[in-house]
């Protein structure tokens, strides 16, 4: 066993002595040591219940004849961090999580790992670590939150609350109505109830094969979560016995399938960023062109909030992720069904008995929302290395208009609230990329303000930052190269005409190459917004969004 490094041989007497101080007995040294990587954090609703969750996982691991050791990671609640400097720490926290898990697991030579994530950056951070460490691993997330209901009976979620702010600001609802939405938008523990980033990543974790069937859709408060925990411990023991590791599971084909599900469900645009980072950790050469190819061959079968009023509980009721995959498998060339997963079985075996139970929630191949995926990669002279739009969350497929430029999210939000943005405008929020932000903050507050004011179909928003999975409308993010790297978005001037063509996958500014070259020569890189601490270091090391915004190792040659 891998853990023999710290528990076998006469020279490991000091190590065993320390381990006995934690409560271990001599007989425990013949059992696999299992890292329980938890993320219990009281300020995050999606993680508040994970303390008890972790206890159940440890019981299941002991029952399977193994020895559990629990530790915690950090986490950031993107909703609470939204709209202020806290959002700059969100994406960088992914790297800290990956590094911290790597540190604990490799320092103590565990034989296997069960990861308990749930919310936005915690799930991909742990997945990155699992691929980096490469020991047998199973993921069991904390599960989605249920949707809420206002006193009037309206179904609401977190995106409803954000959009309610814009609606109140523009006089469309009263303060009492906003308070009613606030009080009911997040009714329980769990990851926010729509197809936002957390649920998107937990669904992708399931199809990748790192998590068990049901992981993405079973609610946090559903007793079936406890059954998943028991299964996870049993399956982990099998993975250890068969030496099946994350890099055996997360192949190029598995990532294709993850993006296929993403396209079928119209997941968060953040999935592109995180899954590209996973590919980097797995040592795979996977780029945005391949994502685009998946998007072109996969139909859009589900519209989940914010694209509709359906939520994760509805997906679960309609058959869950397995039912979506089973329907997708009917189309040749969409899925790779014979690859291994954390169940010890193939994807084909995992979904064999699944079926759609509600075809209003999960559409059939014969009745898709669209013939192509709910996420699309755009390119053009404004995004030479690519940009991402959640095409399933807008009915507008082509938009052209003059740009209104803001050099930060705060500046943009103030401008929107002051009425500086009108129907037909293309809002540009720049210098908010991985390096420029730093941290590539999400733009949920500006998009929600625009939607809440009734301009969601009449104003486009482009940024080198990110969008929350709760964002909708004509929102194009991850523009690469970013402004801080001298990308074309940095060269735009007020009133330039910008064209977004979703069907043709184009993102262009109607300015000649000669004029852009002239502007590039005159452009001066702004001073970094942050020069000290973690964000200062992050800004110096982070790479572009089109490569997952991972950190690069400095070249000291």
Curated annotation (Swiss-Prot):
The keyword Isomerase does not apply. InterPro entries: Dihydro-acid_dehy_C, DihydroxyA_deHydtase, DiOHA_6PGluconate_deHydtase_CS, ILV_EDD_C, ILV_EDD_N, IlvD/EDD_N. Its EC number is 4.2.1.9. It is an enzyme of class 4 (lyase). [2Fe-2S] cluster binds at residues 119, 192. GO terms for biological process: isoleucine biosynthetic process; L-valine biosynthetic process. Pathway: Amino-acid biosynthesis; L-isoleucine biosynthesis; L-isoleucine from 2-oxobutanoate: step 3/4; Amino-acid biosynthesis; L-valine biosynthesis; L-valine from pyruvate: step 3/4. SUPFAM superfamilies: IlvD/EDD N-terminal domain-like (SSF143975), LeuD/IlvD-like (SSF52016). Keywords: 2Fe-2S, Amino-acid biosynthesis, Branched-chain amino acid biosynthesis, Iron, Iron-sulfur, Lyase, Magnesium, Metal-binding. It comes from the Bacteria. The modification N6-carboxylysine is found at residue 121. It catalyses: (2R)-2,3-dihydroxy-3-methylbutanoate = 3-methyl-2-oxobutanoate + H2O; (2R,3R)-2,3-dihydroxy-3-methylpentanoate = (S)-3-methyl-2-oxopentanoate + H2O. Functions in the biosynthesis of branched-chain amino acids. Catalyzes the dehydration of (2R,3R)-2,3-dihydroxy-3-methylpentanoate (2,3-dihydroxy-3-methylvalerate) into 2-oxo-3-methylpentanoate (2-oxo-3-methylvalerate) and of (2R)-2,3-dihydroxy-3-methylbutanoate (2,3-dihydroxyisovalerate) into 2-oxo-3-methylbutanoate (2-oxoisovalerate), the penultimate precursor to L-isoleucine and L-valine, respectively. Homodimer. This is Dihydroxy-acid dehydratase. It comes from Bacillus thuringiensis subsp. konkukian (strain 97-27). The gene is ilvD.
